[in-house]
């Protein structure tokens, strides 16, 4: 399964004409804080792909991409953008079912057709960012300008706020 997923991620990057490179990652170090420390990646160059799941109505999922140094406004912005009454972070099993990916590897590339992607505009201010590679053993270094070219994607100013140190 992971080879199929890896191929789908690469195909999505190629289809979007992305400027990117992939890097191997120890699966035990795939979570953002551990990854950044182990591989000397600045946290503000790392972007987290977060799946939100609606509770009312049930069954609506969306992917949100925010810098690791920021916090997604789930209850206000997430709910409004998804046009649902109640929303929460998708637990690992729901994330896997909705995306085919496991936490620590979720990526905007190769996501299921029709799954909306909301990208915090702050992500776009960087020359490159690191995102998941679809699996916990691969990351993708990518020029964020590609996000504006992906289908079902909206760039959202102020989607996330800076985390106080």
State where each predicted segment sits.
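Extended, low-hydrophobicity, polar/charged segments
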Residues: 1-165
């Amino acid at each position: 399964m992971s080879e199929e997923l890896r191929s789908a991620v690469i195909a999505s990057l190629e289809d979007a004409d992305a400027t990117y490179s992939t890097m191997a990652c120890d699966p035990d170090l795939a979570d953002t804080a551990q990854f950044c420390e182990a591989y000397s990646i600045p946290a503000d160059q790392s972007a987290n792909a977060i799946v939100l799941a609606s509770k009312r109505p049930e069954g609506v999922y969306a992917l949100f991409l925010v810098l690791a140094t920021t916090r997604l406004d789930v209850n206000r912005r997430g709910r409004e953008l998804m046009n649902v009454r109640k929303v929460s972070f998708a637990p690992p099993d729901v994330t896997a079912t909705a995306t085919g990916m496991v936490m620590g590897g979720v990526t905007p590339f190769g996501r299921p057709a029709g799954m909306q992607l909301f990208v915090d505009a702050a992500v776009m201010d960087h020359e490159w960012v690191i995102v998941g590679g679809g699996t916990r053993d691969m990351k993708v270094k990518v020029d964020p300008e590609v996000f504006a070219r992906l289908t079902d994607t909206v760039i959202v100013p102020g989607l996330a706020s800076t985390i106080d140190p």
